[in-house]
Amino acid sequence: MGLFDFLKAKKTTAETAKNRLQIIIAQERSNRGGPDYLPLLQRELLEVIKKYVNIDVDAVKVDLVKDGQHDVLDISVALPEGPDKP
């Protein structure tokens, strides 16, 4: 209800920063069991893709997903829409 919104306590920037930090820590803890080569693999993939397409650093995501008895390497690359040459 819009009428009672002013009675709610506003979130402070400290609370927002704390929530974001908790998310980052949770992600780091979940990646702790993963192999050490994933960050290097991500950087090398980015370098190879940049030879052919002009992409952003955040365009390549590399994750290791445990699926039962198998580990699945999930690689996601967001390519630009147009003919963008390096």
Swiss-Prot record:
Domain of life of the native organism: Bacteria
Presence of the UniProt keyword Cell cycle in the record: yes
HAMAP family xrefs: MinE
Known role: Prevents the cell division inhibition by proteins MinC and MinD at internal division sites while permitting inhibition at polar sites. This ensures cell division at the proper site by restricting the formation of a division septum at the midpoint of the long axis of the cell.
The family this protein is said to belong to: Belongs to the MinE family.
InterPro entries per record: MinE, MinE_sf
Gene transcribed to yield this protein: minE
Protein name: Cell division topological specificity factor
Keyword terms of this UniProt record: Cell cycle, Cell division
GO biological process, one term: cell division
Signal peptide residue numbers: none
Pfam families per the UniProt record, alphabetical: MinE
